[in-house]
From Swiss-Prot:
Organism: Bacillus mycoides (strain KBAB4)
UniProt gene name: trpA
Entry EC no(s): 4.2.1.20
Protein name: Tryptophan synthase alpha chain
Keywords: Amino-acid biosynthesis, Aromatic amino acid biosynthesis, Lyase, Tryptophan biosynthesis
Subunit structure: Tetramer of two alpha and two beta chains.
Amino acid sequence: MGVEKIIAAFENGKKAFIPYVMGGDGGLEKLKERIRFLDEAGASIVEIGIPFSDPVADGPTIQRAGKRALDSGVTLKGIFQALIEVRQEVQIPFVLMTYLNPVLAFGKERFIESCLEAGVDGIIVPDLPYEEQDIIAPLLRVANIALIPLVTVTSPIERIEKITSESQGFVYAVTVAGVTGVRQNFKDEIRSYLEKVKEHVHLPVVAGFGISTREQIEEMITICDGVVVGSKVIELLENEKREEICELIHAVKETEEA
């Protein structure tokens, strides 16, 4: 469990497909059912979003999913309980994507205890600057839960090295300057940026934000160790187009076999 479980998802040259689901969108039973589906479909890690009223890094699709969850009365406590229940059925690593405010409102120690009970292996906090990591990083290290760092296109290489020097799990490389969401084209500068990150960090590098098509996945996966697909997965789940999610997962698996 924990950091080692995330590392295992990348062992022996494995490429990771990491779908994002919003916790509580459609209800907590739906969250458990979606995690079971993604596990059976062959996803490597599942990223579970914690709904928040001011999601500054999220694009419109994820914002709407978070609002649906909050409007239905979903709580962080309820999400943890759902994860505790589904954890007994699946082995797929869990990574939570949460803003800092819900963690502090819940209580840091209580949050981490709940992560341990629910079998959470890592967390991503997009609005936690590197300079303020000590708010939660030492507690996570003791619990063997990875604090996944985010690096961006605009990050100088010295900062990327600094941010990732003591990190665990994988590096989340944000492939756009802006919020999440579906995008049509990735420029050559993104390829150059990802190659630069790969060269200077000691962890697997996962590309995320705006990846939505098989072609984008195939392009990213030749440079990176994995991809996060968020807005597109939420759209496909909402519209019950699960076979298309399976096709995206297969796009990653096929690159391993090539």
